Amino acid sequence: MDPLGAPSQFVDVDTLVSWGDSYEDEVNSSDSTAEAFQEDSNRSPFLYNRDINGKVVLWKGDVALLNCTAIVNTSNESLTDKNPVSESIFMLAGPDLKEDLQKLKGCRTGEAKLTKGFNLAARFIIHTVGPKYKSRYRTAAESSLYSCYRNVLQLAKEQSMSSVGFCVINSAKRGYPLEDATHIALRTVRRFLEIHGETIEKVVFAISELEEATYQKLLPLYFPRSLKEESQSLPSLPADIGNAEGEPVVPERQIRISEKPGASEDHEEDEDEGLGVDLSFIGSHAFARMEGDIDKQRKLILQGQLSEAALQKQHQRNYNRWLCQARSEDLSDIASLKALYQTGVDNCGRTVMVVVGRNIPVTLIDMDKALLYFIHVMDHIAVKEYVLVYFHTLTSEYNHLDSDFLKKLYDVVDIKYKRNLKAVYFVHPTFRSKVSTWFFTTFSVSGLKDKIHHVDSLQQLFSAISPEQIDFPPFVLEYDARENGPYFASYPPSPDL
């Protein structure tokens, strides 16, 4: 995999000793202890797993020197940060990397974006932006750092990468405590390998001397190399080990188990009120949790007596099931359609999401998988204000989403999708589509009606979103130039669409 003439300092990941092979202990001489521990029900949530340990490498060195499928670069939102990791990567990759980065239009905190490796031994570079840490916003920082690691791994999975070299994403200048950040990094990688381990052969943690002691201390907690080490590490695990995917769990947003199961219903209602409005984490924990009497809930629904808060919790649990499935299922066939993607920001600084109607072959794809892909892409986008640009350009009857599917999507998604959606720009509508949209937003989802804006030309769209902030499919530009004049034909389309 080395490029022609690669410098000799590059290190092939296949030559590195795995975490599992680095363990020196009298495992064979303590079979009775191991067997006894296997029978003990008090096992660690991170079980001893020889196969997973064989995929993990702890290596003290420069991540830019790794010969693997992709390495990770930690940077800032404009991808111009000057830190030791980035500077080494830029120096070895050559000037072409800077030119490629300019096409990405930056990267938000927690996101991951891909470029070629150019003169590196690694074929690709995955760029991500770690959070700035402030103790008062600790929860937000934890969630953002989790997203960095998760999105890097998800991108590696989607691109069928066999090996990934991680730098330490939480750079010192952003102030994230090293030990706290390492817990998140290790458990996120561990959970990902548990679920998607068949897609990745090697994950390397490239660390410096300053970070080595922390990683050596915490790795056994999440990647125990024997049953004995698993047992010894159990007391050192933190109270919050995240949900089934390692994502941080906010305690006040969990469904709490009453200390007195026989308490009155009034007491239970008081606790429900204490949950607050934001229930986005309910049901996402990896471990079993006590819920109310299901039969009683169904009876109350039929009688119209179930409270609004209870209905909201029920909806949140349903959404979390969809989200969990979206994160675990292979959706590469839907992603390859390039029908939904993130581009720049509008004039108010809100994220712009693009939907290309002509790229949706409704009769040829599994629409449930399309819904899963929408949730997979939009879940982290919808936490902030955003707008949708829908290109209806040159669609046929085989591209039109029926009202039942749209109603199902609207009913399934979390409340944040609806609350933070500020506008839908319906580009190049037809008379029929305008009528259909009016009926749908009037009788099915009335809350969406005031957010729909029909846009007959790209010039109208540019009054809300500058042309540099949108990646246009070429056929959209050609159609608009033909229908509304050649002014827009000079604006270059995205080469990937």
From Swiss-Prot:
The modification Phosphoserine is found at residue 280. InterPro entries: CRAL-TRIO_dom, CRAL-TRIO_dom_sf, Macro_dom, Macro_dom-like, Macro_GDAP2. The keyword Phosphoprotein applies. Pfam families: CRAL_TRIO_2, Macro. SMART domains: A1pp, SEC14. Coiled coil: none annotated. Residues 43-223 form the Macro domain. Transmembrane segments: none annotated. Keywords: Phosphoprotein. GO terms for biological process: response to retinoic acid. Residues 333-481 form the CRAL-TRIO domain. Belongs to the GDAP2 family. This is Ganglioside-induced differentiation-associated-protein 2. It comes from Rattus norvegicus. The gene is Gdap2.
